[in-house]
């Protein structure tokens, strides 16, 4: 298990980002999807939790075979997807990623949003605080992103919002910018497979970090597109975009219903687990194991002995070996 806490500051308020994150997730998913690969929305419905209150439950399938490194593609099926389940009780959210093909793989993300510059060292509960983890600050203006994802129009150093006047962020902007908020994300990655655990967990964290950086940059760079939206308007945008995304990747499900009014009973949707636990395995998985030596099953003798032709008359065998008719029991 590899645990890291990411802190991503934004030149927004927590109330503003409630709309911004929904808009960004929908648009980003649509842009990153293509025929056969991308994000398929399976469910998006209201959810009620006895502890956290009213929220929104979403389930998605993330098809990403071509985005895997070559060493990973060698051991996964051609049609490969990760299941994402998210419970949004904004400003608190839980997201879990699992894969039926890799039962020992899971990602658990616990997120909290606050109006500060990432200075709260005790934002997560005492149990999480006691776990050894690395705290990583992500700077949307100054941290480098993979070159293939770079767009000058989405670069906070160059972009300036016409509606809010915010933008063109410079190094050190977090120290004096107002307003400012922070996304605190506690990310647990598990891949408890002998021989691959460290490599896979480190790779997944690198991917998670890149996605967080790109997504938060886009949420700010698109602020003029969503800033005046109401919750009903962003939900309608979400519904239309998700249907278009499903068609884009070749999935044609029934129309997606998104509502923030009617609430489903808590028994309808399973609540999120804590970081999904998987038993520690010290043995290599079956598909990586060296075949075991097993004794051969003998369906026939290794040598075949034919009867001596000179003795066949005395063997009392069927006509294949003798011209005599086979013996039959005497009738009483």
Curated annotation (Swiss-Prot):
Can you state which reaction this protein catalyses? a 1,2-diacyl-sn-glycero-3-phospho-(1D-myo-inositol)(in) = a 1,2-diacyl-sn-glycero-3-phospho-(1D-myo-inositol)(out); a 1,2-diacyl-sn-glycero-3-phosphate(in) = a 1,2-diacyl-sn-glycero-3-phosphate(out)
Q: Which organism is it from?
A: Mus musculus (Mouse)
**Annotated protein name in UniProt:** Cytoplasmic phosphatidylinositol transfer protein 1
Give me the ranges of the annotated region Disordered: 272-332
- CDD domains in alphabetical order: SRPBCC_PITPNC1_like
Keyword Phosphoprotein on entry: yes
Task: Cite the entry's keywords alphabetically.
Answer: Cytoplasm, Lipid transport, Lipid-binding, Nucleus, Phosphoprotein, Transport
Query: What is one term from the GO cellular component aspect held by the record?
Result: cytoplasm
Gene Ontology biological process terms, A to Z:
phosphatidylinositol metabolic process; signal transduction
Give the GO molecular function terms. lipid binding; phosphatidic acid transfer activity; phosphatidylinositol binding; phosphatidylinositol transfer activity
Membrane spanning stretches: none
Q: Which Pfam families match?
A: IP_trans (PF02121)
Give the compositionally biased regions (Low complexity): 272-281
Sites of the modification Phosphoserine?
Answer: 119, 122, 270, 274
SUPFAM superfamilies to which the protein is assigned, alphabetical: Bet v1-like (SSF55961)
**Gene3D superfamilies reported in the protein's UniProt record:** 3.30.530.20
Q: Please state the gene responsible for encoding this protein.
A: Pitpnc1
Family per similarity comment: Belongs to the PtdIns transfer protein family. PI transfer class IIB subfamily.
- Modified sites of kind Phosphothreonine: 278
């Amino acid at each position: 298990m590899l645990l890291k806490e990411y802190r991503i500051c934004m030149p927004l308020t927590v109330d503003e980002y409630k709309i911004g994150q929904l808009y960004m997730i929908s648009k980003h998913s649509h842009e990153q999807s293509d025929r056969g690969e991308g994000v398929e929305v399976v469910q998006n419905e209201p959810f009620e939790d006895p502890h956290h209150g009213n929220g929104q439950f979403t389930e998605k399938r993330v098809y990403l075979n071509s985005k895997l490194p070559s060493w990973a593609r060698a051991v996964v099926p051609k049609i490969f997807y990760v299941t994402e389940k998210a419970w949004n009780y904004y400003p608190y959210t839980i997201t879990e990623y699992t894969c039926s093909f890799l039962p020992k793989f899971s990602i658990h993300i616990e997120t909290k949003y606050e109006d500060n510059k990432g200075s709260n060292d005790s934002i997560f509960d005492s149990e999480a605080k006691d776990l050894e983890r690395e705290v990583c600050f992500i700077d949307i203006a100054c941290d480098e992103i993979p070159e293939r994802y770079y767009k000058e129009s989405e670069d906070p150093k160059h972009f300036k919002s016409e509606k809010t006047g915010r933008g063109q962020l410079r190094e050190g902007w977090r120290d004096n910018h107002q307003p400012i908020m922070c996304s605190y994300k506690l990310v647990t990655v598990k891949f408890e497979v002998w021989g691959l655990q460290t490599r896979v967990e480190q790779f997944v964290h690198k991917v998670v970090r890149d996605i967080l950086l790109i997504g938060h940059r886009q949420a700010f760079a698109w602020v003029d597109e969503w800033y005046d939206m109401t919750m009903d308007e962003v939900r309608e945008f979400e519904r239309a975009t998700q249907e278009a995304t499903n068609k884009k990747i070749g999935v044609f499900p029934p129309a997606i219903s998104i509502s923030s009014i009617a609430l489903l009973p808590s028994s309808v949707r399973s609540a999120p687990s804590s970081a999904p636990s998987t038993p520690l395995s010290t043995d290599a998985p079956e598909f990586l194991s060296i075949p075991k030596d097993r004794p051969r099953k003998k369906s026939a003798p290794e040598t075949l002995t034919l009867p001596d032709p000179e003795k066949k008359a005395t063997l009392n065998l069927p006509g294949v070996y003798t011209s005599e008719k086979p013996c039959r029991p005497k009738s009483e």
